[in-house]
Amino acid sequence: WLGVGAILLAQTRSIWLGGTLALGLGLALGWRPAKNVRFVFLGGLAVAGLLALSGPVQKRLMNPANLQIRQVFWHHSFQMQAEHPLTGVGPGQWRIHFPKYGLEGMNPSVAEGVTSEVRPHNDFIWVAAEMGYVGLVLFLAFFILLIVHGVRAYRKDKAHVGHAAWMAILVLTGVYAFFEFPLERAAFWVPFMALAGWHSRGGIALPKKVYLGLAFLLLGLSGRVAWQAIQSDQTNQTVLEQNSRKDARGIVQSATDAVSSWNELDRFSNPLIYFAGMGSMFGEAQSMGQNPTFTSANFKQAEGYFNEALAVHPYHVVTLYQKANLYRYRRDYANAMATYEELLRISPRHPGGQMHYAVTLNALGNYEAAARVLIAAFLGQEYYSNPDYQRAVVEALRGMPASTRHRGLQTFIGMRSQLDDAALFQAFQTFKSQRVPKAR
């Protein structure tokens, strides 16, 4: 009954669906609750009904946004698997390859690289993407063998309630794995694997020394990996603390010390060496005082760190953004433009990327292209009040040719000679607010 309570409190569609199907299968296979618990069972159903009727739960269960995002996850996963059909992109590499196929439609924090997606919320698709047909066949074979063994056990002794319960657990696990990620949830997967071992006993006989030796070997390897994970997490936390304090030297030192063959990414999929690039760039800029002028001789070390970060994670949005900014600071506008374009191919609505791409286009004299970017940009209020954005708008509107074919921009051809910069910017923002939906 604790399990039933946990299912009710989970308030997730996959658990409720899996629990319902598992209960239905258990009843179909002959399980009947004892008389003294039937009232408790009916009470649980009543609680489930009341929860389902409550506003917050209905909003959570019926919200289509999660399903829409999952469709993006799955579509990108199928693309990964199609490019690497036999062996997949490699264990743990889904989160690296996911941005390659585009972040449009993702939450703003994901589109900006503040957070990242690390799994597709479907373990079968996840295994197929990371380990290809080979891994998927083995994963499916594992479940098929459990089902076959469970069916045989049930047929031999239909009166044994444990066999029906095990079949129901398999259904619940299968449904849950189709919409979530039990493979990465130890609280779910460890008990399930223990039950799988318990119900599968009596198979191939091995000498006691052999399976004990294998058990100790696997436990030792798991312990080694767990120890490295704990150590890595501690060093990564030091990097994040230095970064939050903006201690340039400390960031570079802690980030370079943290990198090892065991540890290249933090928990948010940021390459650790990226932080070294930020620390180096920040420190060099600080050392040059106020209003410095940067040239091609500046930020060489930071550029090297960013290149190392992109070698680890080629589609890392934040590294691409900061590398493009680095080129812009050095007035290397051609490379800045190319890098912003690479960023925006991955994350078309990246706010800083859109704004500074327009700034770069202005610097190259491509004012109409800059104006087109700005009029279509989805930005938040903090960007609209940014002086860089305001200057970019005015410069693009005043510099674009009168022959522009963009109907929206044609509106400003006549008024730009009559309005001062502040009024021209305000007119642009008014037009934009009527034309473009507000960024979420």
Model-derived regions, located:
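Short hydrophobic alpha-helices at membrane interfaces in multi-pass membrane enzymes
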Residues: W1-G5, A159-L170
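A membrane-periplasm/extracellular boundary helix in multi-pass inner-membrane enzymes
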Residues: V4-G19, G24-E83, P91, I96, ...
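Hydrophobic transmembrane alpha-helices of multi-pass, membrane-embedded glycosylation machinery
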Residues: W16-A28, F143-L146, V190-W198
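Interfacial juxtamembrane loops and adjacent helix segments
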Residues: A65, Q79-E83, P91-A129
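Membrane helix-loop boundary segments at the extracytoplasmic
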Residues: A128-M131, A164-F192
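Hydrophobic transmembrane alpha-helices and their immediate junctions
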Residues: Y133-A165
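A juxtamembrane structural motif centered on a specific transmembrane helix
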Residues: K156-V161, L195-I230
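C-terminal luminal/periplasmic domains and tails of membrane-associated envelope-modifying transferases
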Residues: L240-R440
